[in-house]
Regions:
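Structured C-terminal helix/loop/strand segments within mature extracytoplasmic catalytic/sensor domains
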Residues: 233-391
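Active-site SXXK
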Residues: 80-97
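Short Gly/Pro-enriched turn/cap motifs at secondary-structure boundaries
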Residues: 49-52, 156, 270-274
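Glycine-/proline-rich flexible loop or hinge segments
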Residues: 68-75, 100-110
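Active-site-adjacent helix/loop patches that line small-molecule binding or acyl-intermediate pockets
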Residues: 2, 10-40, 102-216, 221, ...
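Beta-lactamase-like hydrolase cores
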Residues: 2-7, 13-77
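Short acidic-glycine loop/turn motifs at beta-strand connectors
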Residues: 63-67, 95, 222, 285-291
Length: 391
């Protein structure tokens, strides 16, 4: 029998088929716009000698307190993923305050590279007898130098610090820890309350609650909702230890050459930055022109692209007077920012935030004019040197 004609054991209507999609084209659900339906906008394009080779689409939202002051790319419905760890930790912030040191508090909010210092900080949160409770996936370090670790461990996973802190917090709150990654665990309604509080919407309910890559629940939110939450994160930064912990130890939040760690260093205490999987970055900025807190959320349409997100972040922070260095240069390309990523009041300032450095010349072009040389050497008749064609 042709394999393509063989009935699948999980075809629609068969036992077990409910856990699979009904169609590879994708189903339509009320009030759930897919990435095909939304109005993504170009945010940055990479050009080789004036010609665009890659154009990175996405969405960006700016919020001042509870007000959206700028939106570009549509109010897309997405998942907050690991970008929401500062909010998740607010569920446990009070009970963990006196229990954790600053390194442990920082790693609790992290999506770390899995370096030695990351693993040590995460492991120190729990007693060794509790390590077996950890349910984050087995993984190898996200970034490795020198000796390569090839045997996966839960502690190497980028979310191990969060999982350890949640387990610690649940014990202190007297919550049963079995099944802690499930949305029916008693801590999850407390997390929903945190999101409602920071959105300023007591009636909010997520359209979807999905399983994140690390196994934890992640809620669907619009880009605008996320920006409002990040704005309020800044205005309420003194209510707990989260802002200070992430700024005290930025390299524990991400690690070497990670965007959120580098943003935290650039902000010198005026920024909280957190990356999320599949092209997310949340920024909470303390700025004199925005007294109710400024929240900026970037979402890359096609998913993870640290370099593109970095150029966008440099631009939006640059117009606010915060210097974020350029990422490491592209290979014989240049990045160019789309003006729509910033409110119109910052358009002029955007012109001065260059996407290259003095040691990063135009290596995407030759220093000679090819026309000058080809006109002198090319024959007008390409067959003139092939003889007279014979008798």
């Amino acid at each position: 029998m042709d394999p393509n004609e063989r009935p699948s054991s999980v075809s629609s209507g068969r036992p077990g088929s409910k856990v699979y999609p009904k169609t590879p084209i994708g189903e339509k659900f009320d009030n759930i716009a897919t990435g095909r339906d939304v109005e993504w906008e170009p945010l940055v394009d990479f050009r080789r000698m004036d010609v665009s080779e890659n154009t990175i689409h996405g969405a960006i939202a700016w919020a001042h307190g509870g007000e959206i002051i700028h939106s570009f790319g549509g109010n897309v419905l997405i998942y907050g993923r690991s970008m929401m760890k500062p909010f998740m930790m607010k569920v446990f912030a009070e009970v963990l305050d006196k229990e954790l040191n600053w390194d442990q508090k920082s790693i609790a909010c992290s999506s770390h590279n899995g370096d030695t210092e990351h693993v040590a900080a995460a492991q120190s949160i729990l007693n060794e007898s509790e390590w077996g409770l950890m349910q984050c996936p087995l993984d190898v370090p996200l970034v490795q130098f020198g000796r390569q670790v090839r045997r996966p461990r839960r502690w190497f996973h980028t979310c191990s610090g969060e999982h350890a802190a949640v387990l610690k917090g649940m014990r202190l709150l007297g919550i049963r820890r079995a099944g802690y990654t499930l949305p029916n665990s008693d801590w999850f309604p407390l997390y929903i309350d945190v999101l409602r509080e920071y959105m300023g919407d007591p009636d909010w309910s997520p359209d979807r609650v999905a399983k994140d890559g690390c196994g934890m629940p992640t809620t669907s939110n619009t880009v605008n909702e996320l920006a409002i939450m990040f704005a309020n994160l800044g205005s309420r930064r003194d209510e707990d230890w989260i802002w200070e912990a992430m700024n005290r130890n930025p390299d524990l939040v991400g690690g070497f050459n990670r965007l959120d760690s580098t943003c935290l260093k650039a902000g010198e205490g005026k920024i909280l930055a957190k990356e999320g999987a599949d092209g997310l970055l949340g920024l909470s900025v303390i700025h004199k022109d925005w007294p109710r807190g400024l929240g900026i959320v970037i979402k890359i349409a096609h998913g993870w692209n640290s370099q593109a997100t970095w150029y966008i972040s440099r631009a939006v922070l640059g117009v606010l007077g915060i210097h974020l260095r350029n990422p490491y240069p592209l290979h014989r390309q240049k990045a160019f920012i789309v003006p729509g990523i910033v409110p119109e009041m910052y358009s002029e300032a955007l012109e001065s935030i260059v996407t290259w450095d003095e040691w990063d010349p135009d290596r995407d072009r030759f220093s000679l004019d090819w026309k000058k040389y080809t006109e002198a050497t090319t024959r007008s008749d390409p067959f003139s040197n092939e003889g007279d064609g014979g008798p």
